């Protein structure tokens, strides 16, 4: 249906989170909560409304339904983000994966795809992953 050709940077960040959340058996309540909380609190989303979040999420889901949706989404994310926001995108994706304690193997696989598509330094990616794990530890 959609043949998305571009996203604005905030939409690309949302799309990155949705990719990870949708990787498993569906988007969990904890993943929705994390995505919503991040959009409300992370400075890169300043001025990004709940309505825009809903629209961007729907666009990302539709994109994933395309025949080559995952690869297309990866390219769109990469092409829509300035280099300075690529680590931010990966950090947001890790936060979503951490919402389920990195237990969903499909989400972890998508993180690998995102990391590769964004050409992140492996040490930087590992530090971002470890930071997300540390924030989501439970007693």
Feature map (PLM): residue ranges:
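Small-residue-enriched hydrophobic alpha-helices in membranes
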Residues: 1-139
